[in-house]
Swiss-Prot record:
One of its GO terms (cellular component) is cytoplasm. Its EC number is 5.3.1.16. Keywords: Amino-acid biosynthesis, Cytoplasm, Histidine biosynthesis, Isomerase. GO terms for biological process: L-histidine biosynthetic process; L-tryptophan biosynthetic process. The active site is at D8, D131. Gene3D superfamilies: Aldolase class I. This is 1-(5-phosphoribosyl)-5-[(5-phosphoribosylamino)methylideneamino] imidazole-4-carboxamide isomerase. InterPro entries: Aldolase_TIM, His_biosynth, HisA_bact_arch, Isoase_HisA-like, Isoase_HisA-like_bact, RibuloseP-bd_barrel. Pfam families: His_biosynth.
Length: 251
């Protein structure tokens, strides 16, 4: 089970939002590269970056911070990034800069042809981000709910060749209410590619629950507010996941 610390970037700083609201931002660090180093030193095997300004602007807005993070840890672990990726040129720029994966969210829903082209041009490097509330997909930094069912879109995007799916339950993100295990497993069972859970991770019990469903295709979980607020000790959580995986492998 991959525990993936999130570094959300707003105006060059590392912040956390409550339910995607840019006006409810808590600044956790003015040095995102140092934050990246901290998580890697604590045992992170992948990092999840979000360009929050980019998500709302539709183009890259935190390049300096992203490049600083990649300079710091990009040679050691894979780094993935979402937010504002709307063109093949942007995908190429980010991959050339050293990102391992780019996450396409809103653009995948609004312009599936772009996602298909990206998967063809950059096979193995494209993750799709599906944000949902009550099973329906949301776009544009969560500000718009669509009529699309998550599983329908996931199956379509799997056919395009996406590497994996980051699935966020909007109702729970930044609220420390626990991961929506049921919805995440339902999605993972419907597709043949890995699903990364996101939104609501709050404690070690969530880690236990996720490890139990890893065999269904839930590959990892993005760790956000809980590891910044101190509700969840990241190193202890990764250790717990590794121990559980060992027990399950030996069972």
């Amino acid at each position: 089970m991959l525990l993936i610390p999130a570094i959300d970037l707003k105006d060059g700083q590392c912040v956390r939002l409550k339910q995607g609201d840019m006006d409810q931002a808590t600044i956790f660090s003015e040095d995102p590269a140092a934050m990246a180093r901290k998580w890697v030193d604590l045992g992170a095997r992948r990092l999840h970056l979000v360009d929050l300004n980019g998500a709302f602007a539709g183009k890259p807005k935190n390049l300096d911070a992203i490049e600083a993070i990649l300079d710091e840890v990009g040679d050691e672990i894979p780094v993935q990034l979402g937010g504002g990726i709307r063109s093949l040129e942007t995908v190429e720029k980010y991959l050339d800069a050293g990102l391992s994966y780019v996450i396409i969210g809103t653009a995948a829903v609004k312009d599936p042809g772009f996602l298909r082209d990206a998967c063809t041009a950059f096979a193995g490097n494209i993750i799709v981000g599906l944000d949902a509330k009550d099973g329906k997909v949301a776009t544009d930094g969560w500000s718009k709910l669509t009529g699309h069912e998550v599983i329908d879109l996931a199956l379509k995007f799997e056919d395009y060749g996406v590497e994996s799916i980051v699935y966020t339950d909007i109702g729970r993100d930044g609220m420390l209410q626990g991961i929506n295990i049921e919805a995440t497993v339902k999605l993972a069972q419907a597709v043949g590619i890995p699903v990364i859970a996101s939104g609501g991770l709050s404690n070690l019990a969530d880690i236990d629950s996720l490890c139990e469903v890893e065999e269904h295709g839930v590959e990892g979980v993005i760790c956000g507010r809980a590891i910044y607020s101190g509700d969840l000790d990241f190193a202890a959580a990764q250790k717990r996941a590794d121990e559980l995986n060992g027990e399950l492998d030996n069972a």
